[in-house]
């Protein structure tokens, strides 16, 4: 895996799924391929994106700044600085300085990532902030190692909370989760259906699932009742996937 592919993989792992993720993936690919050289416009676009957390925006802004060539005097952006200040915690700043000194001695992406992984997310973000604010310099490769370590830390905690939701024994949460997944899968099927012969069938399956979820939410049902909806939709989906040759989000 090339360095930029690895960076793209880690950065996208912390972006919530949805149309925005596809858009961000496209921007990253363009930036890494040298096709997008207007850093100012890119940062303005990033700043106004909904859904993303300030830290995710900060990390993306840092990656864009590292990658897109720009004039030396170009102003640093406040939204990136605020996101990479380690929540203003002086402990994070102290640790960030220690980490920065260690990173100065590293020359490879993997070496930097390894060193950075032993620090907390707050310290890692603060260290990125130091580099972003030009208070310190490291090679681009080392900076990317720091980015990927930070994304791995964030993705780990997201995975833990996702796993907690999936394994929760609270039937109300499981029920709602199944209905949300049914809705998003239906939406994805409708979007994909546009260009296939099975479009009518896909739209029909998706529409039924939507109506069912809507009815359940309106009337209120027993938490176990969505299990049947999930099984039906899953069955239809799998048959549809086989014909389409695609793999879609799995249900829990």
Curated annotation (Swiss-Prot):
Annotated stretches, region: Membrane-binding: 1-164
InterPro entries given in the database record: Flu_matrix_M1 (IPR036039), Flu_matrix_M1_C (IPR013188), Flu_matrix_M1_N (IPR001561), Flu_matrix_M1_N_sub1 (IPR015423), Flu_matrix_M1_N_sub2 (IPR015799), INFV_M1 (IPR037533)
Pfam families for this protein: Flu_M1, Flu_M1_C
Compartment(s): Virion membrane; Host nucleus
GO cellular component: host cell nucleus; membrane; virion membrane
Region of interest (RNP-binding), residue spans: 165-252
Sorted UniProt keywords: Host nucleus, Membrane, RNA-binding, Viral matrix protein, Virion
Gene Ontology terms describing biological process: viral budding from plasma membrane
Major location (coarse): virion
Topology with respect to the bilayer: Peripheral membrane protein
Position of sequence motif Nuclear localization signal: 101-105
An example molecular function term from Gene Ontology annotations: RNA binding
Assembly mode: Homodimer and homomultimer. Interacts with NEP. Binds ribonucleocapsid by both interacting with genomic RNA and NP protein. May interact with HA and NA. Cannot bind NP without genomic RNA.
Protein role: Plays critical roles in virus replication, from virus entry and uncoating to assembly and budding of the virus particle. M1 binding to ribonucleocapsids (RNPs) in nucleus seems to inhibit viral transcription. Interaction of viral NEP with M1-RNP is thought to promote nuclear export of the complex, which is targeted to the virion assembly site at the apical plasma membrane in polarized epithelial cells. Interactions with NA and HA may bring M1, a non-raft-associated protein, into lipid rafts. Forms a continuous shell on the inner side of the lipid bilayer in virion, where it binds the RNP.
More details: SC35 was derived from A/Seal/Massachussetts/1/80 (H7N7) by serial passages in chicken embryo cells, thereby acquiring a multibasic cleavage site in its hemagglutinin (HA) and becoming 100% lethal for chickens. SC35 was then passaged 11 times in mouse lung, yielding the mouse-adapted variant SC35M. Most abundant protein in virion. When expressed alone can form virus-like particles in transfected cells.
HAMAP family: INFV_M1 (MF_04068)
Similarity section: Belongs to the influenza viruses Matrix protein M1 family.
Listed name of the protein: Matrix protein 1
Protein's organism: Influenza A virus (strain A/Seal/Massachusetts/1/1980 H7N7)
Gene name for this UniProt entry: M
């Amino acid at each position: 895996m090339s360095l930029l592919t690895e960076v793209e993989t880690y950065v996208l792992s912390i972006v919530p799924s949805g149309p925005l993720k596809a858009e961000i993936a496209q921007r990253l690919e363009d930036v890494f391929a040298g096709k997008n050289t207007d850093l100012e416009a890119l940062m303005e676009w990033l700043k106004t994106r909904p859904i993303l957390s300030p830290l995710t925006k900060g990390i993306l802004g840092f990656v864009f700044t590292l990658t897109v060539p720009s004039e030396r005097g170009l102003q640093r952006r406040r939204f990136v600085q605020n996101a990479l200040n380690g929540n203003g915690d002086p402990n994070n700043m102290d640790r960030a300085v220690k980490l920065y000194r260690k990173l100065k001695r590293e020359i490879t992406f993997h070496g930097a990532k390894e060193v950075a992984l032993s620090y907390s997310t707050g310290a890692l973000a603060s260290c990125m902030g130091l580099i972003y604010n030009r208070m310190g310099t490291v090679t681009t490769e080392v900076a990317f190692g720091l980015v990927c370590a930070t994304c791995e830390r964030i993705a780990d905690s997201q995975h833990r909370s996702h796993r907690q939701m999936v394994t929760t024994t609270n039937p109300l949460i499981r029920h709602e989760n199944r209905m949300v997944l049914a809705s998003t899968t239906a939406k994805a099927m409708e979007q994909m259906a546009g260009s296939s012969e099975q479009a009518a069938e896909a739209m029909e399956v998706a529409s039924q699932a939507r109506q069912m979820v809507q009815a359940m939410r309106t009337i209120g049902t027993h938490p176990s009742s969505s299990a049947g909806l999930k099984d039906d939709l899953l069955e239809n989906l799998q048959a549809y996937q086989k014909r389409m040759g695609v793999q879609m989000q799995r249900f829990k």
